[in-house]
Structure formats: C-alpha cells, structure tokens
Amino acid sequence: MFDYQQPDARGHFGIYGGSFVAETLSHALDELNAAYERYRHDPEFIAEFRNELAHFVGRPSPVYHAARMSREVGGAQIYLKREDLNHTGAHKINNTIGQALLARRMGKPRVIAETGAGQHGVATATICARYGMECVVYMGSEDVKRQSPNVYRMNLLGARVVPVESGSKTLKDALNEAMRDWVTNVENTFYIIGTVAGPHPYPAMVRDFQRVIGDECLVQMPALAGRQPDAVVACVGGGSNAMGIFYPYIPHEGVRLIGVEAAGEGMESGKHSASLQRGSPGVLHGNRTYVLQDANGQITETHSVSAGLDYPGVGPEHAYLKDIGRAEYVGITDAEALQAFHYLCRAEGIIPALESSHAVAYAMKLAKTMRPDQHVLVNLSGRGDKDIGTVADLSGADFYCRPSCRGQSVKGGDPSVVEIQRKAGGVQ
C-alpha cells in the first residue's frame, strides 16, 4: 500500500498549497482551520453530516455498469459513479453541506460562493435555503449566459447572483470577486469555496468532504465487479470531484488515477484549460499550484466548452500527485467531449454534464486499449440539464428553452401571476 499523509500542518502538498493571502484574511483562515480541526473529529458533527448526505442528498450514489457502452466501445468494462443522481444534480452538494455546518457552528449568518458551471452555486443556495442563511453567489457574466438555467435555480432558492464583468468574465474572475467580498465582510461571512483550491485549509477540507465518493466506491466496486477498478477517471478543473474519488484510492497502487483536463480547441491552439499539462508552478487564489501564465507571470486566458473546467489553475494536491507520479493527467477537446455527451445520451439514457463528458470521452479511449476483464471507473460528476442550451447551439439544433424565446406568451401569463412571481423574486 502506498503511504500517503498529505498535507502537512501548514497545508503544503510538497511545494504546493500553503496560504498566500492578504493580512486581513489571515485571522479568518486561522479561525476556520481551528474550527475544522475541532469539528472534523467531533462525533455530533460527523453524525449530522452523514445524516444530511443520506436523507437530504440521497447517498450513497450508485455505481452503474454501462454495459451497452462497454460492449460497443470494446475492451474494458466501464462503470459510472452516478454523482449526477445527487440532490441538485452533482457532487458539489457534498462539500457545501460540510462547510455550511461549519458556518453555523462558527456563528456566520452570511454565506458567499463562486461558481462556474453553476452547480456549486446551486448547491450553496440550496443548503443556505435549508439552513436559513443569507447567500450571495459570484458568477462570471459569460457563465451567467451559458448556464442560465442554474442562475434561475439560484434565484428560486433565494440566492443573489452577482454577475462579474471583469477579466475573462468566467470562474477565475468570480473567485477574485468572492475573495474581495470576504475581505470586506470577514466578521459575519463564511466563504464556501467549491473546489480543492484556495488557501489552506480549503484544499484539504473540500477533499475531506468529497472523499465520500471514493469511500463508497471502495465498497461498491467489489460488490458489483468483484474487485477494485484498474483505473479511475475523473474530469479536472479545480479538481474537487476528482480528488473526492481519487483520495481513498491513493494507497491502492494497482489502481491508475487519471485526471482529464479541458483541451478546448486543442493543446497547441492556446485555447484550453490544461494547467497541469501546459502550466507552470505559480500562486493563484491563495495557493501555490500549476497555473496557466505567461513569461511575466500574468494569468493567461483559458477556454473550454465546459464552464466548470474553464479555470487557469488546479487544486494543489493534483499538482503534487502529478509530480510524484501517483496520478496522470490527460486532455480531451471540446469536440471529443461533445461527442461523448451525445453518445452517452443515446447509448445509456444518461445526459451527462459537459464537465463529466470529458471524463467519459477519455474512458472510452482508454477502454479500447484494455482487456474485457479489466474495469474503468468514471466519476460522472454531474447531470447535463444545465448544458442542453449550449449543446443545442453548438450542434445547430432548433432548441428553445421556453415559448417566450419564440416571442410567444407563456400559458398562464396572467398579470396577477407575474406580480406574484415578481414579489417572490422570480421576475426582476
């Protein structure tokens, strides 16, 4: 078994991680770290967290043998860890519950979050509604446009969504604005970071809340397939779904861990988000990791068809796993991800998120190189309802999200109903 004890007491994964923040946030991070270290071993906290996962989220999520897909692709058997079946439609809810429980115990009534694909924003808004907490979500204006269904979900759940117009108007910029908010309102505000990035203790804390994914797989795979998988595949943007399934498997040296980054329009095009393959060590959002940057250390523009992978950095633990050779990282282009999206819809009746489609696409490639008695486990991190508008646009489909898109009135569009919606916050 591979001996793995990371991070160290200061939040370092080898040379990565740590805490590079303004002095105004140092106290808040120390306070958060102390609270996490206290409650992570507290039986009452653990019991409440597990109860919420079981009865609010619907865990454990199943592992599903994609038999038709395996047969048609050829080679190894492909299994899907169905995080798309969680309440809110992705893995993000696992982490938001853990952090919201911490926020309540720390007496922080206001919660902020950043979001790219919108799934972390929806998960945060959901748990804030459940616990009666104020919720503000920062989202790049480009992502607001391409993930509009999730923006409306957040509004329905009572969150205030703040479009970010600076920079590339995507996840990186949303995270910047959330950090600025936290500095200003640190006394009453808890920042729920959605991925395994940010300053210590966030990378380890988010990983620990997400490890339930891999812990379940350790039990489910032997029951379903007779043994552990030969390879575990997950998409990597910031990397929380990947760390969630990778972490429990790190000691199992016979299991390959493969992270799939967004190769966008191709690695040589410059239009991608593959920080582990094309980046270099640098500091971003409070931690040292692999970053896409120019010769002067300026963050470069990224691209992915998937909003959740459109990020110029990655969690520091992924950087460490790459350097020590325990995990490997590959790229999948927009075109390959879209092809896998459509294939999984038709072959298995599952509509995956575009983020997850990157992992599915690589798993299909990998399976072909393996024997039929081998197994590939894919973390299907989220469902694709949020992406159907984007996919329709890219495929040229005649898709309309609602009758009003065609200039038609909506059935039941009575003025009194609209006024009720307006008062409820549904119409701005």
From Swiss-Prot:
PANTHER family: TRYPTOPHAN SYNTHASE, TRYPTOPHAN SYNTHASE-RELATED. This is Tryptophan synthase beta chain. The modification N6-(pyridoxal phosphate)lysine is found at residue 92. Tetramer of two alpha and two beta chains. Belongs to the TrpB family. It comes from the Bacteria. Its cofactor is pyridoxal 5'-phosphate. Keywords: Amino-acid biosynthesis, Aromatic amino acid biosynthesis, Lyase, Pyridoxal phosphate, Tryptophan biosynthesis. The lineage of its organism: Bacteria, Pseudomonadati, Pseudomonadota, Betaproteobacteria, Burkholderiales. It catalyses: (1S,2R)-1-C-(indol-3-yl)glycerol 3-phosphate + L-serine = D-glyceraldehyde 3-phosphate + L-tryptophan + H2O. Pathway: Amino-acid biosynthesis; L-tryptophan biosynthesis; L-tryptophan from chorismate: step 5/5. HAMAP family: Trp_synth_beta. Its EC number is 4.2.1.20. The beta subunit is responsible for the synthesis of L-tryptophan from indole and L-serine. GO terms for molecular function: tryptophan synthase activity. GO terms for cellular component: cytoplasm.
